[in-house]
Regions:
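C-terminal capping alpha-helices of c-type cytochrome domains
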Residues: 247-253, 318, 322-356
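Accessory recognition modules or surfaces
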Residues: 251-267, 281-296, 300
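Electrostatic cytochrome c docking/interface patches
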Residues: 164-167, 246-276
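Periplasmic/extracellular electron-transfer cofactor-ligation site
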Residues: 226-235, 272-297, 304-309, 324-333, ...
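Solvent-exposed, polar/charged alpha-helical surfaces in well-ordered, non-transmembrane soluble domains
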Residues: 250, 269-280, 296-299, 317, ...
Length: 356
């Protein structure tokens, strides 16, 4: 018989070990693929202000973020390198020093002073850069031609233009022009934030704060309340739509008009009557007897991309879903879930589609 130097591993155990290694490798691969996909998705996300800036009020802040991140990364790398070097370095023992007549190491304080000096210079440079950035975003380069008022409610945004136009959760601005935004709150503290266009500004009850935004390119920019304000804080979004001046002027003129005349169609008339009975206490439609002030103005509802403060796309089906199941979609919002018969739902939906 031949002696062995270790335990005998059966074929089945060897197979299980191989499968275990393959499974671990597969899990690691899946993890890194998922992590990479998440990183790519975040990089392209509408709220990513670290990699994207599309306006002069956001670009300096983005660059400041890069600079501070680079500074922190450099400090972390230097400290880590020094720490690893100190751990790996072998110093002679006391007995070895005595045998070789070596003196104990010392004189390390000069490194402390060097590190303190470099850190002080870096921190003061960072402070100076922060002050320069604050100055750059405090005021636009030229006086704004347009000032709008944005009022925050639980959990939606009212937008008023000087011409008398009123929208909800949707701000239109001319591209390439600074726009001053006056911010106020009707209930609690919120925060107005369009990451790719500007920084955050709080809306405080009884106080009017100001901010300015400007878009370098036409497009749709996501905005979000960034101050926790209750159960539906995460669903308190809005959009800033930047468009050429001529297109903006046409939009603004249309938004200032009252509701278009309603045809004599029986379904539309029934829908208008139902709206007056069930919705007019909170909502308003200019040009009608609906003058509610507690909820969004719906005069031009059909022209908006989203409803429910960004929770749903503005389609006929989603409008009806929102009306009938508001408390399921946004629990604790002031919008109640309204029970409707099939005929009433059809009539109300048809009426809402005319509000453009």
């Amino acid at each position: 018989m031949r002696a062995t130097n270790g335990p005998i591993i059966s074929a089945s155990e060897s197979k299980r070990a191989t499968e275990g290694r393959r499974s671990s490798a597969l899990r690691a691969t899946v993890f890194w693929l998922c992590a990479s996909r998440c990183a790519i998705a975040y990089a392209d996300g509408p709220l990513n202000y670290f990699l994207h800036a599309d306006g002069p009020a956001a670009t300096p802040t983005m660059r400041l973020g890069w600079a501070l991140t680079a500074l922190v990364a450099a400090v972390a790398l230097i400290v880590t390198a020094l720490l690893v070097g100190a751990i790996l370095r072998r110093r002679p023992l006391a007995a070895e020093r005595d045998a070789q007549h070596l003196q104990a190491e010392g004189g390390g304080m000069h490194w402390v002073w060097i590190g303190t000096g470099i850190s002080s210079v870096a921190l003061f440079a960072a402070l100076a850069y922060v002050l320069v950035t604050l100055e750059a975003v405090a005021e636009p380069g030229r006086a704004p031609r347009l000032t709008i008022t944005v009022t925050a409610y639980d959990w939606w945004w009212k937008v008023d233009y000087p011409s008398g136009a009123t929208t909800a959760n949707e701000i239109h601005i001319p591209v390439g022009e600074p726009v001053r935004v006056e911010l106020q709150s009707a209930d609690v503290v919120h925060a107005f934030w369009v990451p790719r266009l500007a920084g955050k500004t709080q809306t405080i009850p009884g106080v009017i704060n100001e901010q300015w935004i400007e878009a370098d390119h036409p497009g749709v920019y996501r905005g979000q309340c960034s101050q926790f304000c209750g159960a539906q804080h995460a669903h308190m979004a809005f959009e800033v739509i930047a468009e050429p001046r001529a297109q903006f002027d046409a939009w603004l003129e249309n938004q200032g008009q009252p509701r278009a005349a309603l045809s004599a169609d029986a379904t539309l008339q029934a829908g208008a009557q139902l709206f007056q009975e069930r919705c007019a206490g909170c909502h308003s439609v200019r040009g009608t007897d609906a003058v509610g002030k507690q909820a969004p103005d719906l005069t031009h509802l059909g022209s908006r991309r989203l409803i429910a403060a960004g929770a749903l796309l503005n389609t006929a089906a989603n409008q009806l879903d929102w009306i009938q199941h508001a408390q399921r979609i946004k629990p604790d919002s002031l919008m109640p879930s309204i029970a409707l018969t099939s005929a009433d739902a059809t009539a109300l939906c048809a009426y809402l589609q005319t509000l453009r």
